């Protein structure tokens, strides 16, 4: 009998392989909850991190194909729920958790991705009001980006036809959910800006779950909406649904039907607005006519009493003469003071030569002063004559003196400006430069150029 039974001796590789088989067979689909730490994402695209709790930790790896499908970005300190399997990395003798799927703890992955992208774009200013373009009040051509087979396009067309059938609609059919939907929506927005020549766009779809609406939460769609030169109305889902596209768009409509109602006014609304503007125009014209009538009445009152106008003109002429007299008197005083100063200067300096020269200067200055004074007087007289002639020309009495007359319609004594104020048998008072006469209208003739022989 052998003291020691036969021993089975394993190599390190064999032992590691056995351990790997046991772990991978028994831990093939496992859900694990923990907190992320040591997160790394190298150029390879793989995701490396440690999942830990208060008592232990495990290394995790998520290969690039799975990592690219993530809707959100994990961060250190974030709580995760992961699904995967245990594998052994034989070269180091380590075991690790190969993650196939993960989601944030306490909130869905899509909801977290929505929050993260919303915060990112808000910081970049994509939601700012200064970027919002005004929606045209009466567009001629409307572009629609939605599914060609969904209920949304039928709702939009029905509303547009009911409210304003003359508007032209260009439809760009796209996928609105599933793989590639975001790419098609963004491309359609870009194409409308490049070729569509539309006045406004409606981008949207009918209701659905968060997953169904997710294409409108993609960053590429948000940036296409932001870069659009054409105003965009976002109409995704129902009234309670909000997407990233809603925040970036120039206007958010709760439903596709509401978007159609916002983009065009009904014929009744337009007719009501036209009637409102017509009423305002009539009021404005009436106010202008009333103001003009008041001014005309003021002028008419002034013409009825020409003595008032003559009185004002006479006062102006009196003021001119008073200023003229003061100017002449002041100039004479100045010249007199100058002569007196020269005399005093001569008295102080008595040599005969200086006296003679001073006398000659005094005579010369006196002559110049007299000439200048006469010139001033002549200019003031000429100015007074000109003003007097102008006043005479402006005077209604002067007009009468030149052979004209003024016709007043009796009994109101209203000045007659046109024959249309007259009727047969009307009594008139004619004012002449000297005297007045009364007459009666026997006939009327519209042609002012005709003469009676």
Swiss-Prot record:
Keyword Transcription regulation recorded: no
Pfam assignment, any one: tRNA_anti_2
Known function: Bidirectionally degrades single-stranded DNA into large acid-insoluble oligonucleotides, which are then degraded further into small acid-soluble oligonucleotides.
Enzyme class: hydrolase
Compartments reported by the entry: Cytoplasm
Gene Ontology terms, MF aspect: exodeoxyribonuclease VII activity; nucleic acid binding
GO biological process, one term: DNA catabolic process
EC annotation from Swiss-Prot or TrEMBL: 3.1.11.6
Keyword Hydrolase on entry: yes
CC per GO annotation: cytoplasm; exodeoxyribonuclease VII complex
Catalytic activity field: Exonucleolytic cleavage in either 5'- to 3'- or 3'- to 5'-direction to yield nucleoside 5'-phosphates
InterPro entries: Exonuc_VII_L, Exonuc_VII_lsu_C, OB-fold_nuc-bd_dom
Organism for this UniProt entry: Geobacter metallireducens (strain ATCC 53774 / DSM 7210 / GS-15)
Protein name (record): Exodeoxyribonuclease 7 large subunit
Keywords: Cytoplasm, Exonuclease, Hydrolase, Nuclease
Family statement drawn from the similarity comment of this UniProt entry: Belongs to the XseA family.
Subunit structure: Heterooligomer composed of large and small subunits.
Top-rank taxon, per record: Bacteria
């Amino acid at each position: 009998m052998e003291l020691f039974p036969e021993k089975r001796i394993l190599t390190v590789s064999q032992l590691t392989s056995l351990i790997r088989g046991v772990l991978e067979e028994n831990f093939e689909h496992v859900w694990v909850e923990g907190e992320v730490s040591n997160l790394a994402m190298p150029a390879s695209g793989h995701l490396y991190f440690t999942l830990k709790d208060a008592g232990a930790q495990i290394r995790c790896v998520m290969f690039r194909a799975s990592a690219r499908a993530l809707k959100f970005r994990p961060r250190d300190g974030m709580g995760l729920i992961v699904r995967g399997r245990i594998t052994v990395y034989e070269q180091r003798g380590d075991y690790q958790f190969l993650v196939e799927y993960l989601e944030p703890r306490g909130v869905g992955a899509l909801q977290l991705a929505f929050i993260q992208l919303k915060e990112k774009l808000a910081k970049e200013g994509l939601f700012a009001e200064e970027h919002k373009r005004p929606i045209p009040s009466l567009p001629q051509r409307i572009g629609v980006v939605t599914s060609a087979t969904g209920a949304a396009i039928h709702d939009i067309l029905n509303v547009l036809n009911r409210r304003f059938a003359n508007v032209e609609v260009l439809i760009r059919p796209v996928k609105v959910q599933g793989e590639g939907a975001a790419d098609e929506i963004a491309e359609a927005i870009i194409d409308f800006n490049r070729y569509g020549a539309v006045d406004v766009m409606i981008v949207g779809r009918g209701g659905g779950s968060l997953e169904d609406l997710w294409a409108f939460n993609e960053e590429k769609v948000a940036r296409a909406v932001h870069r659009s030169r054409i105003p965009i109305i976002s109409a995704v889902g129902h009234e309670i649904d909000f997407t990233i596209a809603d925040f970036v768009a120039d206007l958010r409509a709760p439903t596709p039907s509401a978007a159609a109602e916002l983009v065009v006014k009904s014929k009744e609304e337009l007719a009501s607005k036209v009637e409102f503007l017509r009423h305002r125009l009539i009021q404005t014209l009436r106010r202008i006519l009333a103001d003009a009538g008041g001014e005309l009445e003021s002028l008419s009152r002034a013409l009825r009493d020409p003595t008032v106008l003559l009185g004002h003109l006479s006062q102006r002429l009196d003021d001119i003469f008073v200023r003229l007299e003061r100017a002449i008197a002041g100039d004479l005083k100045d010249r007199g003071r100058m002569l007196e100063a020269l005399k005093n200067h001569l008295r102080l300096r008595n040599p005969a030569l200086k006296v003679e020269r001073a006398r000659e200067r005094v005579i010369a200055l006196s002559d110049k002063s007299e000439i200048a004074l006469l010139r001033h007087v002549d200019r003031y007289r000429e100015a007074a004559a000109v003003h007097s002639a102008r006043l005479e020309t402006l005077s209604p009495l002067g007009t009468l003196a030149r052979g004209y007359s003024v016709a007043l319609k009796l009994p109101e004594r209203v000045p007659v400006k046109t024959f249309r104020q007259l009727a047969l048998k009307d009594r008139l008072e004619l004012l002449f430069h000297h005297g007045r006469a009364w007459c009666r209208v026997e006939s009327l003739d519209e042609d002012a150029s005709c003469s009676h022989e």
